[in-house]
């Protein structure tokens, strides 16, 4: 039973890491931003970016909508 949990946990970590790497890929980011009108739109709260498919995070320091990546995904920007 413990081995099954270990295998499932390892698979989960690999999937999370792969998703994080893919989200940081510049080509993929540019492709999504090209088709998401919310990207780089000025915002002050998360609700301002809620209509986006890829750029759903309000980056406070930039004041624009952007994607959740890396640490920002964990802390909710």
Swiss-Prot record:
Induction: The MCPI RNA, but not its protein, is highly induced by wounding the leaves. SUPFAM superfamilies: Plant inhibitors of proteinases and amylases. Keywords: Disulfide bond, Knottin, Metalloenzyme inhibitor, Pyrrolidone carboxylic acid, Signal. One of its GO terms (molecular function) is endopeptidase inhibitor activity. Ovaries. Disulfide bonds join 39-55, 43-58, 49-65. It comes from the Eukaryota. Coiled coil: none annotated. The record marks 69 as: Interaction with carboxypeptidase. Residues 70-77 form a propeptide. To potato MCPI. The presence of a 'disulfide through disulfide knot' structurally defines this protein as a knottin. This is Metallocarboxypeptidase inhibitor. It comes from Solanum lycopersicum (Tomato).
